[in-house]
Amino acid sequence: MEPRDPSPEARSSDSESASASSSGSERDADPEPDKAPRRLTKRRFPGLRLFGHRKAITKSGLQHLAPPPPTPGAPCGESERQIRSTVDWSESAAYGEHIWFETNVSGDFCYVGEQYCVAKMLPKSAPRRKCAACKIVVHTPCIGQLEKINFRCKPSFRESGSRNVREPTFVRHHWVHRRRQDGKCRHCGKGFQQKFTFHSKEIVAISCSWCKQAYHSKVSCFMLQQIEEPCSLGVHAAVVIPPTWILRARRPQNTLKASKKKKRASFKRRSSKKGPEEGRWRPFIIRPTPSPLMKPLLVFVNPKSGGNQGAKIIQSFLWYLNPRQVFDLSQGGPREALEMYRKVHNLRILACGGDGTVGWILSTLDQLRLKPPPPVAILPLGTGNDLARTLNWGGGYTDEPVSKILSHVEEGNVVQLDRWDLRAEPNPEAGPEERDDGATDRLPLDVFNNYFSLGFDAHVTLEFHESREANPEKFNSRFRNKMFYAGTAFSDFLMGSSKDLAKHIRVVCDGMDLTPKIQDLKPQCIVFLNIPRYCAGTMPWGHPGEHHDFEPQRHDDGYLEVIGFTMTSLAALQVGGHGERLTQCREVLLTTAKAIPVQVDGEPCKLAASRIRIALRNQATMVQKAKRRSTAPLHSDQQPVPEQLRIQVSRVSMHDYEALHYDKEQLKEASVPLGTVVVPGDSDLELCRAHIERLQQEPDGAGAKSPMCHPLSSKWCFLDATTASRFYRIDRAQEHLNYVTEIAQDEIYILDPELLGASARPDLPTPTSPLPASPCSPTPGSLQGDAALPQGEELIEAAKRNDFCKLQELHRAGGDLMHRDHQSRTLLHHAVSTGSKEVVRYLLDHAPPEILDAVEENGETCLHQAAALGQRTICHYIVEAGASLMKTDQQGDTPRQRAEKAQDTELAAYLENRQHYQMIQREDQETAV
């Protein structure tokens, strides 16, 4: 199919904005035809030229695959279509349609270029949108202009125009011009350095939004023949579903010939084994090309999990994968997608959400009876996530690059997970006096993957669930939720509502009656556990030794562990203890004589007197995150004793991490050395953690020689400094999966979220390093007037009184600007309270950056305080200095929410804008090539 010529409007002289795409075009000044070298191939692309030696591509009507004819009834141009933020699966879906999200990115010029940008003519600045799949940014009013420059997004499907739907096809690159580009040129190996990149209009790179390869935008690096080369789909080619597999089907025509065929085949259809789902017409069909090297992936994201984590992570997957393999579960669930991809060989699934999301997908797979069932990996969002912990995926998503997650899914081991049936029926022997009007005869779920429990824990969960249903506005804060849980648990303990549990139940396991044993134990909670983890990571079965009658717990052995909890063992569970082991069995018959709170995988209810049978349902196929293998082992397998590693340990504060973790060199410079540890060469991080925690306990150790080191907090974690283009945190639950040699070279970095204060930074002003003189410079003896007060208290008083000169004098004399009062309020807190702009500016300029996000005893930062007081200028100072707008106080409020409560709508709008900008900055940097 020959490419069409660019429209006259596309022949522009705008050299400041251009695009090169397998479905797009380039724009720039027309070079003289006799001087412009052309590609020496049979196929020519009108408008494609070289402009001297500066640019590789400057203007193009390039169409590797001419756009398919428009679907009847579908809008023709981008401007006539609605602005979509989701993938269009209807028959009118546009070829190469962008997926737009709102953005506050201000450093990127509008992609359509100055000639076609309509926003510059508007009186106010226009909002911008960013395509999640190809990362271009345009003004919202300019989206329709993309049609004029003939630029489309990377195609996610192909048309079924040929009778041979399995005709050999390949994917072409989708080249896009970039004004900013990280990484190095694939041809020359040099970086894309450019001065003043934030406001530059210069095109510095050409990159493919499929394989992420990037080249300098000059003819010496990017050759014209590369435009038509097949794309490898990049490092994740094994999991990316190529657009050539996805065909848009044509709706059958009701012609006379077709109707005769329909009548002739009607008897066949009556005897067909296809279900109604399989037989109905769909706009898109999947025609895979099987390959033993491929593990095609479907990603299901629950956007409601983990706050807004789910909604944000969808955008990252749209960038790395084909948008038609990423599904938002709030748009209809997983069934349609699984039906459509059911015939794809070697399929894998990534469930992004909590354990409930995983259970939803597993139940859908049961209903569809896919053979073989695709293995399911987990990206845990939110809290809890005991199944994800069991399979080594961790207790929650922190900031691991999506690219690394895709690699883990591809390389993960396939394991089995027992799933258990729950059958409940009313107990006919229960008397009418035992009936409870608030009880139900049905369980919330009829299958469980994690656990089934009754008693104390189910009662607390049920109280929380019912209270949240009645007053959802009171449960919008994680802190409040925890406080409610604690209060409910304490009141339930005092009332003893579950102390007589053993009197009202009968438990028979594999034909053995455990009721007498349970009545002797008098547990307040009984758990039937399938996996080792329970209650956000605890291990209630523990590790039975060889002298016990029990086996270690497994999630694939066809056995349930039955555990009883007294109040003592429940308390011990949180500090590494375990419950009372009752038995391991294959079948349970549980009879309750009265209404009792129960929960199934965290879903609670009050179940009327019932007979409950628990038996093995089936085994689900899961993906377990594999332990990483060192690419360069430090010793050969023949060595009996591992080589010893001597590694420097350096600590990073949370403020420095949030500000600099995309810049490795700056973050390394900001780190504070703790000392040196010596570990075996094959150590994993669990073993290394023990050595680091002993570091400061040794009186003669390296840690003791560092006078500025504060003790490590209990929440510190390792940072991976080698396997990605930036630093990222390693979940503590996954430390046993990572070797020391894989995350560090000569130095290992750890993140301490509670590291705060002047002593964390060795380069702070001291009495021996005076500041430059100022009009407020003290005269000899000028500081003696307040000698009765300690220097720290004098600083506090100076901030309270708005005494700028006094504050400067004290600082020059060695005063600690990170000093706090008895309520943990910093000098900046006091300066904000008095509204002293001069003192605030001085503290922001001279105090260490940790002061920005320092919290007082109520959890408030100085920005929370300024927002609540409506101090707009001070808020601006603090935000521009780099304060986090996403920190919450003890009420769960961000600074923006504090401004809203103060009814300052303009300030709230400003803070919301800057908060969104902070989030977008992180996302943009995370997609660096």
From Swiss-Prot:
Gene3D superfamilies hit by this protein: 2.60.200.40, Ankyrin repeat-containing domain, Probable inorganic polyphosphate/atp-NAD kinase, domain 1
Q: What is its main location?
A: nucleus
Please list where the region (Disordered) is annotated: 1-46, 59-80, 257-281, 421-441, 760-783
TM segments?
none
Q: What is known of its domains?
A: The PDZ-binding motif mediates interaction with PDZ domain-containing proteins like SNTG1 and SNX27.
Q: Which EC class, in a word?
A: transferase
Taking every annotated instance into account, which residue ranges of this chain make up the domain DAGKc? 292-426
Motif Nuclear export signal positions after renumbering to this chain:
362-370
Per UniProt, the ranges with Basic and acidic residues bias are: 1-14, 25-37
One GO cellular component term, please give it.
Answer: cytosol
**Organism name:** Rattus norvegicus
Q: Which reaction does it catalyse?
A: a 1,2-diacyl-sn-glycerol + ATP = a 1,2-diacyl-sn-glycero-3-phosphate + ADP + H(+); a 1-O-alkyl-sn-glycerol + ATP = a 1-O-alkyl-sn-glycero-3-phosphate + ADP + H(+); 1-O-alkyl-2-acyl-sn-glycerol + ATP = 1-O-alkyl-2-acyl-sn-glycero-3-phosphate + ADP + H(+); 1,2-didecanoyl-sn-glycerol + ATP = 1,2-didecanoyl-sn-glycero-3-phosphate + ADP + H(+)
* ANK repeat ranges, renumbered to this chain: 823-853, 858-887
Q: Where is the composition biased (Low complexity)?
A: 15-24
User: What is the protein named?
Assistant: Diacylglycerol kinase zeta
Q: Assembly state and interactors?
A: Interacts (via PDZ-binding motif) with the PDZ domain of the syntrophin SNTG1 and that of SNX27. Interacts with IRS1 in the absence of insulin; insulin stimulation decreases this interaction. Found in a ternary complex with IRS1 and PIP5K1A in the absence of insulin. Interacts with PIP5K1A. Forms a signaling complex with RASGRP1 and HRAS.
User: What keywords sit in the KW lines?
Assistant: ANK repeat, ATP-binding, Cell membrane, Cell projection, Cytoplasm, Kinase, Lipid metabolism, Membrane, Metal-binding, Nucleotide-binding, Nucleus, Phosphoprotein, Repeat, Transferase, Zinc, Zinc-finger
Q: Under which EC number(s) is this enzyme classified? A: 2.7.1.107, 2.7.1.93
